[in-house]
């Protein structure tokens, strides 16, 4: 994939990808609701940005060019799609053990409503990119019974089943949706990190926002992903591919 313009990195931890794009000589900026590390270029309510763009109102998307110019890579919040969230849809969930059945039901209905809202945002974001001819890659976890496996507008373009093989901290099977573009196929092997379990990480503080620990991406993984699946760029650690 050739990027003649700029890469726009959306949501938490996208700054890691931004930095690696810049190291590779590609201009990039990141956008997030939070700025916990003091490095975010643009602190925007991306949920409102998506809603406005979908409704035809002025938005950030108006400044993003289509065709072969710009690229969006969006690490869309997964908190209500994850398998852990799915386990909280049952009365028998451990978190509800001290609640009455009505209280359990209310908690479940609240979670389902939040999931519906974020599902809608993800679908709208992809629709906006599709209709405007903007290249976009959306990332979301793909382990066990994650909600999007059976309940999304289209299947993922590709799944990275073991991110540790490309230098990440987590195994964390991850799906990627490519809109108006196709992935290249390379394999830059780098398995040199101590494995971290998602269950050992802290939970997020508010709805739709994952904790920094759970969403952490290693710079090595970001660089290897960019070279393997976006730029088609060989590295010293690149392996031969069947594609």
Q: Across the structure, where does each feature detected by a protein language model lie?
A:
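Conserved active-site and SAM-binding loop architecture
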Residues: 1-243
